Amino acid sequence: MIWKNYGQRTLLMPAPLLKKISMLKYISVFFLLISSQPSFADTKETYRQLSIFNEVYNRVKDQYVEEVTDKELIEKALNGMLQALDPHSSYMNEEVYKEMQIDTSGSFGGLGIEITTDKGFIKIVSPIDDTPAQKAGVQAGDYITHLDGTSVVDMTLKEAIDIMRGEVGDPITITIVRGTERPFDIEIKRDVIKVQSVKHRIINNVGVLRISTFNEQTTVGLKKSIEELEGSENPPIGYVLDLRNNPGGLLNESVTVSDVFLQKGEIVSIRGREKKDVQVFSAKKGDMINGKPLIILINEGSASASEIVAGALQDHDRAVIMGIKSFGKGSVQTIVPIDSGAVRLTIAKYYPPSGDSIQAVGIIPDVEVPRAELNVIDSYFTFRESDYRDALDNETTDGNEEEEDFNELLENDYQLSRAIDAVKTIAVLN
């Protein structure tokens, strides 16, 4: 999850002075400046460690088999330092930082997958709806072992992303390991990824809200969807909020999405290293669906912001959680701009209202429902000619075609079918 914060700037040393000292001395001063009143012993140990860094740095510069630039070495050193802390901390150079800003705005180029590092490989957290990766059959939990034949063992996320992104239309072959199956190749054509984070449908008088990611457009899109459904001639009797394969996104969006369904109470608390570093986010009065039954669908690809929403609504007994245990990412990152790049740093863990961390544990569903294929529901949430506001009617149809589509959808997506049945049951009991 990203705590969006593009405004911080840190000036470490005046520019003229930087020209007079070596890169190593700059790093040494950096470490000393960020230390809070170090003791003499701490300072001495810091200098000792930096002298080791200096020796290694000079050895690499003088003797490595290929020539490397200072910029390249320093970027790799910074990334190594941060990624050794946890998989979600990293250094972003100017190019990567710009790409990250595009990602959170909702339009970018690539394959359409959220990835992390795990066991030396690249793990797919989830494919994004209606993207080349999702259409090619990539699944949450898949491991990527090769990119165009190049092994990804111990490859950084940045290096993997650099390979996966390229010219629109150019193909890339990724080698996948899925469960106990033998590795297999999938060819995917790169495309511009335009994420419509919220889609909606009414199925059997139940509103189905699909959120694929949490970007700057998510809460606005969710509210518009609910307003449209509630304002229809036959409003839904209840809702299914589908967060399956949603890798997360912006913290503030997870808070405002949760608030759409809550009247009051804590949504999430963010706790940093110090006891005083606690921030609590609470709901404002106003449930947009007026207490109607709500089922939330999750799976192992539901992470971060998805888990905040599911956890908050579960702890307040506002929704029943169905599906499979979620991913278990309970940490918060902040983005700190430095020069033309930025540092992504884990600064806190988040806790649902219960106070129990979900880090590496995940959200446990109230009702466990086995995995279901998502290709049917994802392809169903696409626009057709009939979706246009002023589309011409076909006088020869009687509506049975749409009913058949719904039936086929529910037959192929067992989790969604169970969720819709649950909404109907709760509505009757209420």
Which role fits each region the language model picked out?
Residues K349, S354-N430:
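Conserved functional hotspot residues or short segments at active or partner-binding sites
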Residues D42-E55, K61-Q63, T69, D86-G112, ...:
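Glycine-biased strand-turn-strand hairpin within the trypsin-fold
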Residues S22-V29:
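Sec-dependent signal peptide recognition
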